[in-house]
């Protein structure tokens, strides 16, 4: 397998001076939204003894369960994939007593790939798409 890329000219400002250099970047061939549940389920069904419908149901429930657990203040780690976590934020207040639940909110939900998962994925070769 290989990941398609294109070559684009971009500004390099690392030296303090603007310099145009060429870079390999993600191709627009990667569909926006990527592989959806149905396609993922079909692929997984071919590799396991489970039916596509069962896998789609599990994927759907997985999303709901992760959302529920994150909403309860838990982080969720899918072994081999990585953890899902939330970050909280609030506006600055003059005293600790002013930092009330109504002023604190989730600023983002993030995922950090498992190090082994990342290492293996980084071994994937890339394939240049001509101009």
Predicted regions and their residues:
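Strongly charged
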Residues: 1-57, 61-131
């Amino acid at each position: 397998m290989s990941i398609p890329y294109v070559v684009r000219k971009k500004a390099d400002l690392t030296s303090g001076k603007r310099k145009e250099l060429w870079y390999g970047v993600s191709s627009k061939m990667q569909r926006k939204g990527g592989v959806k549940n149905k396609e993922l389920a079909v692929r997984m069904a071919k590799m396991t003894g489970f039916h596509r419908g069962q896998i789609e149901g599990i994927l759907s429930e997985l999303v709901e369960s992760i959302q529920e657990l994150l909403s309860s203040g838990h982080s969720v780690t899918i072994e081999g994939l990585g953890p899902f976590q939330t970050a909280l934020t609030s506006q600055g207040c003059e005293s600790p007593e002013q930092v009330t639940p109504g002023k604190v909110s989730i600023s983002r939900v993030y995922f950090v790939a498992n190090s082994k998962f990342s290492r293996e994925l980084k071994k994937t070769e890339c394939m240049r798409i001509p101009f």
